[in-house]
Structures are given as C-alpha cells and as structure tokens.
Amino acid sequence: GGYVLSRAQRDRIGEELGPSEIQITEDLFIGPTTLAEREGGMMHLNHSCEPNLGLQGQVVFVAMRDITAGEELTFDYAMTDDEPCEMECRCGSDTCRKLITGRDWLKPELQKKYDGYFSWFIQKRIDSTK
C-alpha cells in the first residue's frame, strides 16, 4: 500500500522520510506520507541483485521464481527507478553490482534478465529501442 505522490510531494516528504517510495511513472511515485507509515512497513521491500519478485504493470509484484517460506521478499531497484541516485549494495548475491544507480535499467544485461518484470513505464522505454 501507499499513496500516489507527485514529484513535488515526493520531494517534500522525502526530506523527512528519506527514500521510501517506488516510482510508478515518469512523474508519479507511491509511498508512505508519514514516518509512522514508513516505520509500520508500508512500501518496505529491500533491493537484491538476485531478486525473487518482479513487477507487472505499475504496482503489482509477482514471484519470478519459487520463494521458500520465511525467505525475504526482494526486488531489483532497476525495475522501478529512473532517478539520479546511487546506493551501495550489500545484498551478498554472487552477481551483486556493488553500486546501484537510478539508471541501471539502461544496462543491456539487466534489460535481458528482467524483460517483462520492469515497471510498465520503464518496460515501454526499453521496448521502444528494440
């Protein structure tokens, strides 16, 4: 769950909460609006370079493989992010990229790996270059 936020709303809320949203279009995001919502787990999914979840459409997460009971649910931020940002990755996977950026979706190897699992607005951009 979460609230649909404009870029301006996301920027204002982000000053207090830090990054806690998922980008769903070029200019819209979904996320919590208060610290209590964020701390309560709203929109809390961690990144992994070997995720078990992908996206269908804008906000529906689906399993990309079988997930065992108790396994953490993760997705690759490359599936949703198109913002100028950087984050050190410590996911521990064999394919860890070490540095995650808001432009990782441009990498051909990730486009191939996650084809059909990107947020629709990113998938549309990728498909237009094929």
How should each PLM-predicted stretch be described?
Residues 47-130:
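C-terminal SET catalytic tail plus cysteine-rich post-SET Zn-binding segment of SAM-dependent SET-domain
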Residues 1-53:
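Catalytic cores of histone-lysine modification enzymes
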